[in-house]
């Protein structure tokens, strides 16, 4: 089936079922909580640390988001920033980066250190952002290394991938067909996501506010919707009412309490 026909059929499907779905937005969806960069806004924790993953697990987060970079010597390092304390993730050696401390006194962890901690837990999922590289030719190796390590530690079935770059997303979908991949950049419609093989969208709060209809459209296509980064009660209420599947937040306990309150528990 060529792309034009496939797109036409998807749009026909949406036009048929969207009116009914629009009437039930937010109903029946059990929104799940994802701790942004782990649960770090709590005593003794830090962003993208082993502790933040374990603390996310300790409060029952559905998922703990983590950022990973590929270093100059081809080691995967957990950190958000492209440059951290003067060290550029892509051009420095892993030994230099791993010797740098986080705000809670821990050293910057390798990806394997996070996976080792994850293996000791049984519930919380890893929401893994593979970071864009300046050298896109490294994407096949970077994704392949991620896939091998997830299998090595036995946590592939508890991991979901999130990416910004289109080339990186395509490589993840190609190399990890059994793993759900979500798009972060906000520039693809639900129909385009479906066509490219994504499991759903993981879009910034402002993008989803400007395109509320995408939530129902995504659900109609069997896709899921995650939104980031939602930290106030008012905005949490907004996206719960919209019926998103996941909310990524720096305030996971606040969101958990709100969900319990709304369910009457």
Model feature map: region roles:
Residues 1-28:
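Bacterial Sec-dependent N-terminal signal peptides
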């Amino acid at each position: 089936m060529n792309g034009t026909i496939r797109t036409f059929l998807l749009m026909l499907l949406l036009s048929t079922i969207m009116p009914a779905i629009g009437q039930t937005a937010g109903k029946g969806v059990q929104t799940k909580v994802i701790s942004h960069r782990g649960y770090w806004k709590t005593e003794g924790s830090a962003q993208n640390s082993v502790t933040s993953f374990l603390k996310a697990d300790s409060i029952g987060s559905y998922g703990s988001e983590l950022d990973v970079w590929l270093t100059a010597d081809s080691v995967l390092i957990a950190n958000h920033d492209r440059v951290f304390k003067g060290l550029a993730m892509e051009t420095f050696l892993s030994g230099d980066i791993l010797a740098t401390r986080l705000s809670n006194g821990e050293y910057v962890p390798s990806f394997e250190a996070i996976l080792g901690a994850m293996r000791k837990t049984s519930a919380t999922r890893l929401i893994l952002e593979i970071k864009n590289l300046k050298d896109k030719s490294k994407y096949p190796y970077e994704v392949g290394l991620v896939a091998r390590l997830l299998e090595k530690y036995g946590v592939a079935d508890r991991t979901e991938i999130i990416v910004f770059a289109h080339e990186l997303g395509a490589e993840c979908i190609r190399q990890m067909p059994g793993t759900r991949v979500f798009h972060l950049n906000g520039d693809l419609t639900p129909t385009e996501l479906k066509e490219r093989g994504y499991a759903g969208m993981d879009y910034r709060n402002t993008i989803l506010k400007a395109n509320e209809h995408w939530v129902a459209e995504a659900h109609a296509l069997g896709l899921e919707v995650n939104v980031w980064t939602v930290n106030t009660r008012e905005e949490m209420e907004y996206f719960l009412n919209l019926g998103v599947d996941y909310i990524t937040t720096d305030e996971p306990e606040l969101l958990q309490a709100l969900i319990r309150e709304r369910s009457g528990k």
